[in-house]
Amino acid sequence: MPAQIIDGKTIAATVRQAVKQQVKERIDSGLRAPGLAVVLVGSDAASEVYVGNKRRACEDVGFRSFDYDLPITTTQKELEKLIEELNDDDAVDGILVQLPLPAGLDATPILERIRPDKDVDGFHPFNIGRLSQRIPALRPCTPKGIMTLLEHTHVDLHGLNAVVVGASNIVGRPMSLELLLAGATTTVCHRFTKDLSDHVKRADIVVVAVGKAEFIPGEWIKPGAIVIDVGMNRLPDGRLTGDVEFSVAAERAGWITPVPGGVGPMTVASLIENTLQACVDYHDVR
């Protein structure tokens, strides 16, 4: 029996509509709209697309959008100075610096300079630390979005075997923390993992984020498993595909995310949720 599709577009639209309604209620009651500052350095084509999506989503739900498009010649000190200014701006609830940064700029001190209560990407060590201690504050967007997708399957994750393929700071590592928090028995696989197929074949939940087209053969998927494909890869013929061999996996899995239309929309929706959360929990005048 073919897998049920986890429709990220539809779920993300529901999340954004809920945020939009809350923003309307805030404004109607005399409170200000949440504000999101998006910083783009240089003119990387893919980054421009991602930033455009985030800014449109911001405006769609009624946020104030503060746009900073900086030249590729921007220095480390100039970028750090801008972050400090945004930290001190009471109209800004969230600060997002689009990654990757151009060569010559070090992202780590930039991201650590963002105040944790304005770190709506969820990358600051404070927010990662809170997640690891089981007291999450602002959660990393892609893993948070994936957890929302999993909630919509109505599958109880407690005790299930979860395998995360990929150990990046953006997805793999925080994803493992989210799954642990949800009660799953969690394994993280990476480039040094031996017998990757054995790990995947026993997994009730598989999250793949490696950035390699169809890296995971569909035949590895355990019958009935939940498959979350974070990858977004463009083939020579122009088609987009994920990190999992979808056509075969979809015949074995119980649930599966498509590419595109699965995880991607949820990342932006989670960013919007985090910005509202930062505004309400940390910045509203009590």
Curated annotation (Swiss-Prot):
Record pathway: One-carbon metabolism; tetrahydrofolate interconversion
Gene3D superfamilies xref list: Leucine Dehydrogenase, chain A, domain 1, NAD(P)-binding Rossmann-like Domain
InterPro entries linked: Aminoacid_DH-like_N_sf, NAD(P)-bd_dom_sf, THF_DH/CycHdrlase, THF_DH/CycHdrlase_cat_dom, THF_DH/CycHdrlase_CS, THF_DH/CycHdrlase_NAD-bd_dom
Record carries keyword Membrane: no
Keywords in alphabetical order: Amino-acid biosynthesis, Histidine biosynthesis, Hydrolase, Methionine biosynthesis, Multifunctional enzyme, NADP, One-carbon metabolism, Oxidoreductase, Purine biosynthesis
SUPFAM superfamilies recorded: Aminoacid dehydrogenase-like, N-terminal domain, NAD(P)-binding Rossmann-fold domains
Protein residues bound to NADP(+): 166-168
GO molecular function: methenyltetrahydrofolate cyclohydrolase activity; methylenetetrahydrofolate dehydrogenase (NADP+) activity
Catalytic activity as recorded in UniProt: (6R)-5,10-methylene-5,6,7,8-tetrahydrofolate + NADP(+) = (6R)-5,10-methenyltetrahydrofolate + NADPH; (6R)-5,10-methenyltetrahydrofolate + H2O = (6R)-10-formyltetrahydrofolate + H(+)
One Gene Ontology cellular component: cytosol
Keyword Hydrolase among UniProt keywords: yes
EC number: 1.5.1.5, 3.5.4.9
Function: Catalyzes the oxidation of 5,10-methylenetetrahydrofolate to 5,10-methenyltetrahydrofolate and then the hydrolysis of 5,10-methenyltetrahydrofolate to 10-formyltetrahydrofolate.
Family the entry assigns: Belongs to the tetrahydrofolate dehydrogenase/cyclohydrolase family.
Assembly description: Homodimer.
Matches recorded under PANTHER family: C-1-TETRAHYDROFOLATE SYNTHASE, CYTOPLASMIC (PTHR48099:SF5), C-1-TETRAHYDROFOLATE SYNTHASE, CYTOPLASMIC-RELATED (PTHR48099)
Name of protein: Bifunctional protein FolD
Organism annotation: Idiomarina loihiensis (strain ATCC BAA-735 / DSM 15497 / L2-TR)
Gene that this sequence comes from: folD
